[in-house]
Amino acid sequence: MINIKNGTESDKQRLLSKYPNLDKYFFGNGRLVIAEDGNDIVGFLWAHRRKISAPVEAEEMFINYIEVFKPELRCRGIGTQMVQKIIEIARAEQVYQIRAKVKTENVSSHRLWLKNKFSISPAQMPDGNIAVSFVGYVL
């Protein structure tokens, strides 16, 4: 059974010992959510808190990374549970919104955000191409 929980510094170190390249994503005043199967971390979400300037003048959580490591566990609700956990944390911390950036071609990620009632705003480049979408959830 998969357990979703607030991650600890120990959990973060367990992740980094197995996936050292993830260290570049763990920055800022962050929150870690992990998905565990027994003692095995099978997924995680990292979001950092940052200020939003005028006209909002509030704080948001920006999701830097969300991943379910094992392909056979993807599309089984683990990502949704981690997103719901970060929404719960953000509400408790009284932030204004949660946002993330998604590559346009990542269709399964777009489905995850829509399922969790995030708005999707494609970012059109000067050449007319849409390279990324920003997703947002106002609390």
Residue ranges and their predicted role:
Residues 2, 6-71, 89, 138:
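Acetyl-CoA-dependent GNAT
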Residues 24-25, 35-36, 80, 86, ...:
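Preference for well-ordered, secondary-structure-rich cores of eukaryotic proteins
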Residues 33, 122-139:
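C-terminal "cap" of GNAT-fold acetyltransferases
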Residues 68, 75-88, 111, 115:
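Conserved acetyl-CoA-binding loop-helix of GNAT-fold acetyltransferases
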Residues 90-102:
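Conserved GNAT acetyl-CoA-binding A-motif
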Residues 104-122:
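Conserved active-site alpha-helix within GNAT-family acetyltransferase domains
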